[in-house]
């Protein structure tokens, strides 16, 4: 069985019972007899019988940028575009949970879509302090206040992501199987903010998360994938310091895994993107033209 599922938990037991019903109906009714026999004889393995009776899919890439920027609807409620980094992190984890409850495989989120919301938080704090202390405090002091508040919100937001993913339960009886794609795109106007976010994600993963006994352990999720490019490949690039942190993190916590942006561009027509959850990559879509 899936080792991510704790069979002592009531919600997981319900999922496992439903899975056995699905397997039975799949073998007896849905599959051709020769496929069922081949599966039983070990000639082949028919995957995911425990979900086959439902019209749901396996893995996906979440279009998190569109859902955050333009808002989305969950449970019949409109979720508007966030006005701060903390709220963006919370909304993102709710989307992850909703997606995990509607499929049975992994999912991936590109964290670079969070950068603009960290800047929104900075702009909000800067406006607040400027209006409150204009002419009373030097601009550089105001910037120190802004930096302190932004760093606090950054830590809290990333902690929200880590705690939510590791504590939320979904309808398939486990925490969301999710990958965070850590990509510093040189063309991204929010690359500075995203560098801060990725660095904080790595720092918190390096620290680990406390178990029920208060001991720091390595969380199973989110899986982390770190993209290596010219500016962070330990060749004197601007973001080499983040890569060095990533290597320390991998040595202690097994993640992140690494992807070469150069090879991705060669193999996928100039595109750099995450696998869906763990290892399956989509191919570039083309129509008949």
Task: Name the predicted role of every residue range.
Residues 1-289:
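Conserved catalytic cores of very large enzyme subunits
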């Amino acid at each position: 069985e899936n080792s991510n599922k704790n069979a002592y938990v009531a919600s997981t037991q319900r999922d496992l019972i439903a899975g056995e019903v699905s397997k039975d109906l799949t073998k007896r009714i849905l599959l051709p007899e020769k496929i069922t026999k081949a599966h039983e004889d070990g000639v082949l393995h028919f995957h995911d019988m425990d979900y086959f009776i439902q019209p749901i899919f396996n893995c996906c890439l979440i279009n998190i940028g569109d859902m955050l920027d333009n808002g989305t609807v969950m449970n019949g409620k409109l979720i508007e575009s966030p006005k701060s980094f903390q709220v963006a992190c919370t909304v993102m984890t709710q989307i992850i949970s909703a997606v995990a409850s509607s499929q049975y495989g992994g999912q991936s989120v590109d964290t670079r879509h969070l950068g603009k919301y960290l800047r929104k938080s900075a702009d909000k704090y800067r406006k607040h302090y400027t209006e409150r202390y204009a002419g009373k405090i030097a601009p550089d002091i105001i910037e120190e206040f802004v930096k302190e508040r932004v760093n606090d919100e950054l830590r809290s937001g990333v902690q929200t992501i880590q705690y939510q993913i590791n504590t939320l339960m979904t309808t398939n009886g486990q925490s969301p199987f999710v990958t965070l794609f850590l990509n510093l795109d040189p063309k991204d106007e929010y690359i500075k903010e995203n560098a801060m976010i990725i660095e904080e994600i790595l720092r918190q993963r390096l620290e680990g998360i406390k178990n029920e006994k208060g001991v720091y352990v390595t969380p199973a999720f989110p899986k982390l994938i770190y993209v290596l490019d010219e500016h962070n490949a330990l060749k004197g690039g601007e973001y080499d310091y983040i890569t060095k942190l990533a290597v320390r993190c991998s040595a202690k916590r097994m993640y992140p895994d690494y992807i070469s942006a150069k090879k991705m561009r060669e193999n996928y027509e100039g595109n750099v993107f995450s696998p869906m959850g763990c290892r399956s990559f989509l191919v570039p879509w083309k129509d008949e033209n």
